[in-house]
Amino acid sequence: MNRLKDKVAIVTGAGDGIGRGIALAFANEGAKVAVCDLNKTAVMDTATIVREAGAEVIAEQIDVRNPAEIQSFVAAVKHRFDRIDCLVNNAAVMPIAPADSIESETIDLILQVNLRAPILFSRYVIPSMREVGGGSIIHMASVTGHNGHPGVTVYGATKGALIALARGQAIELAEDNIRVNTVSPGTVDSPMLHRFLAENASDVKKARMAFDRIHPRGKVGSIEEIAAVFVFLASDEAANITATDIRCDGGYAVQGQQPTG
């Protein structure tokens, strides 16, 4: 408890799933939390949960495709809390789009949400982190940034790009004591997985079991397991960790199996 006491953290894409889990985990460790999401109802629900955990919170509906909204949100967080210590770039989209038929509009959507938004969020929080003597930027990557996965090639490309982005940012910002890292989950038992199965699997139960089987420990990860990694990277315990990607995937990326069924 209190590993993040008095730190101010921004979590994007916090309307549900892993983003909400990270926000709650940060709150439980003493952080003040700023959450945003495209879904207003969902992000306000997250704010309520965080507040009930005893943390101060600010929540806004924003479209991360809009640079002005990103800049405005970061400014609002700085105005409210007078500092920013941590940024979690979690917001993402993952349309299923085969390489031979993906539409230009879909490419633009994935690039804007998954890559441009983290770059812009980083740009706007860096001055505040410099003011307080450092900070932690954590980008949500994915095993798809390491291994090839059919149907999500552009999504995987953006996740691989985030890993490269973090390494470059980490070196550039090291003298400012701003650490930059990525986390690459495997499959996680989350609303995103549930939506993916509902939209793409003919037999949801069978497909869900297939995802469990391809992970060496026999099950997919949990939101709490992923959130714990983010807490660690945001804390002073990770003071010497930067330019690093932590694969939190139960060994999935090493064996590289694809789900079937």
Where are these regions (language model features)?
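Conserved glycine-rich cofactor-binding loop
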Residues: 8, 15-17
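Substrate-binding pocket helix/loop in short-chain dehydrogenase/reductase
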Residues: 98-99, 103-111, 211
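Active-site helix of classical SDR
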Residues: 122, 158, 166
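Residue(s) in the substrate-gating loop at a strand-loop-helix junction
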Residues: 142
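Short C-terminal tail/terminal secondary-structure segment
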Residues: 147, 242-261
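C-terminal helical subdomain
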Residues: 182, 190, 204-241, 248-250
